[in-house]
């Protein structure tokens, strides 16, 4: 797992062996290596000076990166690998998703979850907090689930569901409008590996984007919120403009090379 600190100065890296590293990227310097996990670290989330990590060892670690004795707390609430973690600094809540199909909400550094959501029927890797409405959380389920679910984490109540018909790999809210972007893998139809844009709360579909030939595991939004980049197992990065009409992908890409193309979303 990889995750930038909020100011973009430090990069946290989770390794296959369970180590967590913090890098100063500008100086190309490894600042510290932290022990604790006993298996791969695939989920990482920052909350100011708190670095939270989730692992295949089923544990969630809270660490204070300012001090030598960094370990604050270990949480043992998932029965399988912790595959999704996202902090919401505005309401001091942490969402954790697991391969046990569970979505848990934690308040601050508490020992026990504030809410437990059991509705997903596959791993919950895709998690995204809305920047537009406090306590609004979206989560996406894997191949046996294929749903995006919305939650009010202030009340602990489920809100609405989108059945996407595809494995949900990643989610991100549009920074400038009340829309959510989802990336996908295996589909029950012939629409595999697509990217979809949904309007909230109407849940109407704004656009469907195709081009990747393997599941779209990675999704990042530009600081301005005007474009996104997606990465897939097909070894391509694709850049999408959020503000202009979608058009068909014309590129013929070499699957073995890392290439990028710029495409219009709508």
Walk through the language-model features, giving the residues of each.
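Short coil/turn segments that connect the beta-strands within blades of beta-propeller domains
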Residues: 7-9, 48-49, 90-92, 134-135, ...
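A beta-strand-loop signature enriched in Asp, Gly, Thr, and Trp
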Residues: 112-177, 181
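Conserved strand-to-loop turn within each blade of WD40 beta-propeller repeats
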Residues: 14-17, 53-57, 90, 96-100, ...
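Solenoidal tandem-repeat scaffolds enriched in leucines and small polar residues
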Residues: 32-116
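Terminal intrinsically disordered, low-complexity extensions flanking WD-repeat/beta-propeller proteins
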Residues: 144, 155-158, 165-167, 175-176, ...
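Canonical WD40 repeat/beta-propeller blade segments in eukaryotic WD-repeat proteins
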Residues: 1-4, 39-46, 80-87, 122-129, ...
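Short C-terminal beta-strands that terminate individual repeats in beta-propeller domains
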Residues: 30-36, 54, 71-77, 97, ...
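WD40-repeat beta-propellers
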Residues: 20-24, 44, 60-64, 85, ...
């Amino acid at each position: 797992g990889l995750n930038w600190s909020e100011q973009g100065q430090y990069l946290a890296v989770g390794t296959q062996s369970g180590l967590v590293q913090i890098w100063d990227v500008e100086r190309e310097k490894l600042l510290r290596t932290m022990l604790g996990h006993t298996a791969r670290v695939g989920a990482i989330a920052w909350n100011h000076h708190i670095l939270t990590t989730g692992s295949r060892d089923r544990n969630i670690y809270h660490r204070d990166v300012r001090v030598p004795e960094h370990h604050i707390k270990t949480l043992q609430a998932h029965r399988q690998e912790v595959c999704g973690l996202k902090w919401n600094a505005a309401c001091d809540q942490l969402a954790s998703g697991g391969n046990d199909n569970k979505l848990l909400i934690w308040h601050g550094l508490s020992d026990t979850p504030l809410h437990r959501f059991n509705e997903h029927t596959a791993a919950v890797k895709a998690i995204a907090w809305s920047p537009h409405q406090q306590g609004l959380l979206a989560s996406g389920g894997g191949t046996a689930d294929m749903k995006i679910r919305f939650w009010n984490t202030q009340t602990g109540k489920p809100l609405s569901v989108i059945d996407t018909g595809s494995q949900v790999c990643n989610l991100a809210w549009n920074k400038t409008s009340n829309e959510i972007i989802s990336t996908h893998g295996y589909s029950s139809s012939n629409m595999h590996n697509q990217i979809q844009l949904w309007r909230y709360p109407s849940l109407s579909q704004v656009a469907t984007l195709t081009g990747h030939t393997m599941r779209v595991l990675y999704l990042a939004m530009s600081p301005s919120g005007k474009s996104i980049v997606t990465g897939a197992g097909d070894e391509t990065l694709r850049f999408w403009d959020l503000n202009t009409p979608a058009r068909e992908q014309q590129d013929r890409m070499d699957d073995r090379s890392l290439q990028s193309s710029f495409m219009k979303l709508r």
